[in-house]
Amino acid sequence: MPELPEVETTRRGIAPHLEGQRVSRVIVRDRRLRWPIPEDLDVRLSGQRIVLVERRAKYLLINAEVGTLISHLGMSGNLRLVEVGMPAAKHEHVDIELESGLALRYTDPRRFGAMLWSNDPLNHELLIRLGPEPLTDLFDGERLYQLSRGRSMAVKPFIMDNAVVVGVGNIYATEALFAAGIDPRREAKGISRARYLKLAIEIKRILAAAIERGGTTLRDFIGGDGQPGYFQQELFVYGRGGEHCKVCGTGLREMKLGQRASVWCPRCQS
């Protein structure tokens, strides 16, 4: 699933080609996503100029002069730029054609993504309860410490809770906990303030590094410019269960936590 760095990489790839451009038409080939694409999307968006392309958590917000297109890439979706008129392959559900001659094409083989319309996106039901962005001053270790008090759940699903902080998905939660030396199975309430301060620093560092390297390409992800991400080359533990720790050589362990595969080093993490 594309996580925050992959979505931010997509935003950075498409924004320069969308902002300031006028939409000539919208082609919807299949409306059957996680939520159906609105029947009137073409009417609402065609003829409008795109003002700004933003990201909130893992949602892309394509702001027009009036209204906003909210897009989520789901499990395996992507948005990329193609030339208007390029034949569409299977699973290429939507084209947003621009007067520049480019089109923003939405592909989603598993159809778990979304393309919705809102006149008040930040108060949309999918966004209104989201926690702070991890790369802003609204998120820090003190927030993690305070919210963890009384929480008996494991620390990994705790930091993956979008009400606590957005965008810390399975890949980056796994890597941040390793970097901070914290066992992902530990109860959230049992971790000290000092260790949460360290964890928040590592979350920020790892997410920023992943964005800089274009995200992590494990299966389907490509950025808005059609290029893969390269952060997978720097993964220490994610997807490496049973292999040796790159730091100490101990065998990495793996188990399910909150329905997600979790990998950790029993020596480096406690």
Swiss-Prot record:
TM segment ranges: none
Catalytic activities: Hydrolysis of DNA containing ring-opened 7-methylguanine residues, releasing 2,6-diamino-4-hydroxy-5-(N-methyl)formamidopyrimidine; 2'-deoxyribonucleotide-(2'-deoxyribose 5'-phosphate)-2'-deoxyribonucleotide-DNA = a 3'-end 2'-deoxyribonucleotide-(2,3-dehydro-2,3-deoxyribose 5'-phosphate)-DNA + a 5'-end 5'-phospho-2'-deoxyribonucleoside-DNA + H(+)
Cofactor, how bound (note): Binds 1 zinc ion per subunit.
Binding site for DNA: H91, R110, R151
Entries under InterPro entries matching the protein: DNA_glyclase/AP_lyase_DNA-bd, DNA_glyclase_Znf_dom_DNA_BS, Formamido-pyr_DNA_Glyclase, FPG_cat, MutM-like_N-ter, Ribosomal_uS13-like_H2TH, Znf_DNA_glyclase/AP_lyase, Znf_FPG/IleRS
EC number: 3.2.2.23, 4.2.99.18
A Pfam family recorded for this sequence: Fapy_DNA_glyco
Any one biological process term the GO annotation gives: base-excision repair
Family annotation (PANTHER family): FORMAMIDOPYRIMIDINE-DNA GLYCOSYLASE
HAMAP family to which the protein is assigned, alphabetical: Fapy_DNA_glycosyl
Name of the protein in question: Formamidopyrimidine-DNA glycosylase
